């Protein structure tokens, strides 16, 4: 019986997530990131329902990986064919045609010659398909459509209704229980699905709690002088609400005298090449699972810890770092600048331990040397941090650019900081 490995790849993630102005960014960035994960999760549900795969254990067995805007499914004949693939792609294209983001399907027939060649072919197929997004809806690309705020049914503006719902659900305490989303995706009611599967439980964002609120009031009482300048504060400091970027910058100012926001991006080097050396789909699935566990569980553990910043001040990461995107092999964080630097150092140490554990695990025969991370950090003026720039430069003023290459290599735990002031026109 022929078997097929199906890949779903969300295209345009970075442009979609960061196409937001600074005002409201704390509300919307995580919501947009969560929407990306919702696309892959509901696409997997749709495909498994389509092939009548009902048993939960069987569904888990078919799903190799889901994270970072990608998923991999194992299907067999006769449940899968090229015609079925075209029908699924057409359905997803029609659903997402007005969503500023797309889901690209690719597949490869698994051979007896080894998984590495199958993986190479799947990568080539995926890269080709990315060149023609929404190709099944070509005629519809040239028809008028509204901006997504219409109340009517249909596919127009899925993401706007869903992101608006998620923005409030994720940033304001108890709001999820008090409202209905009015949005659907791939035939599922978003609010109902999230409720049934507890998908908003465990989502980490920096939140106000009583000890923090008391500490803030105590600090203000001890330091009665007025603020040096206005701050970009949008969300009420109320227990359970998300801490916005203006307050994160303010916390950094209290500790260091400088109210900057740090932005950290990390990803694993040459991960696709490593997957291409896997000898079997079993090892591929196991490695994918380990990577996903690290980026989801280990990072959540680190965010719950304390650390010392460059000045010896104790920082609680949970009050100072906003994880925008944590995927299967990469992640993106925004936070108080001193907390971001301290967190990057902690991540360095944790990833080294993880990378060494893979080398020493006999289950991963293809992992012969430790994986490495590459990372970059910028420190920006939080009042001018416009994330909506289409050209990727942003409307912010970059104060420091920090390069962290091959994060996991070598025995030296260091971050190189290149100092300089660069405005967005000079990037």
Task: Locate each region found by the language model.
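Regulatory and interdomain segments flanking nucleotide-handling catalytic cores
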Residues: 1-427
């Amino acid at each position: 019986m022929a078997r097929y490995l199906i890949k779903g790849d969300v295209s345009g993630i970075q442009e979609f997530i960061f196409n937001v102005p600074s005002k409201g960014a704390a509300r919307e960035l995580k919501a947009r990131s969560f929407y990306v994960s919702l696309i892959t999760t509901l696409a997997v549900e749709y495909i498994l329902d389509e092939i009548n795969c009902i048993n939960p254990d069987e569904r888990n067995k078919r799903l190799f990986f889901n994270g970072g805007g990608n998923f991999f499914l194992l299907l067999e004949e006769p449940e899968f064919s090229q015609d079925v693939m075209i029908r699924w792609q057409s359905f997803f294209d029609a659903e997402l045609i007005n969503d500023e983001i797309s889901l690209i399907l690719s597949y490869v027939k698994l051979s007896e010659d080894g998984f590495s060649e199958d993986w190479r072919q799947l990568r080539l197929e995926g890269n080709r398909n990315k060149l023609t997004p929404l190709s099944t809806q070509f005629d519809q690309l040239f028809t008028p459509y509204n901006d997504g705020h219409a109340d009517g049914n249909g596919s127009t503006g899925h993401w706007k209704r869903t992101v608006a719902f998620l923005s409030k659900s994720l940033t304001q305490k108890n709001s999820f229980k008090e409202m209905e989303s009015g949005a659907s995706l791939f035939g599922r009611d978003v609010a109902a699905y999230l409720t049934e599967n507890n998908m908003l439980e465990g989502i980490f964002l920096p939140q106000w709690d009583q000890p923090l609120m008391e500490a803030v009031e105590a600090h203000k009482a001890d330091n009665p002088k007025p603020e040096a300048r206005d701050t970009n504060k949008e969300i009420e400091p109320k227990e359970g609400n998300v801490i916005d970027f203006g307050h994160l910058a303010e916390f950094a100012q209290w500790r260091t005298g400088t109210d900057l926001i740090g932005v950290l991006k990390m990803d694993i080097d040459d991960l696709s090449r490593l997957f291409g050396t896997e000898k079997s789909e079993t090892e591929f699935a196991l490695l994918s699972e380990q990577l996903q566990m690290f980026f989801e569980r280990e990072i959540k553990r680190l965010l719950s810890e304390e650390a010392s910043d460059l000045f010896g001040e104790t920082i609680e990461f949970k009050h100072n770092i906003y994880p925008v995107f944590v995927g299967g092999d990469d992640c993106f964080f925004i936070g108080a600048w001193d907390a971001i630097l301290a967190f990057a150092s902690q991540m360095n140490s944790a990833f080294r331990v993880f990378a060494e554990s893979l080398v020493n695990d006999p289950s991963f025969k293809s992992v012969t040397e430790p994986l490495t991370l590459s990372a970059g950090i910028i420190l920006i003026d939080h009042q001018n941090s416009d994330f909506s720039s289409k050209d990727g430069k942003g409307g912010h003023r970059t104060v420091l650019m920090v390069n962290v290459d091959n994060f996991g290599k070598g025995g030296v735990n260091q971050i190189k900081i290149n100092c300089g002031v660069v405005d967005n026109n000079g990037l």
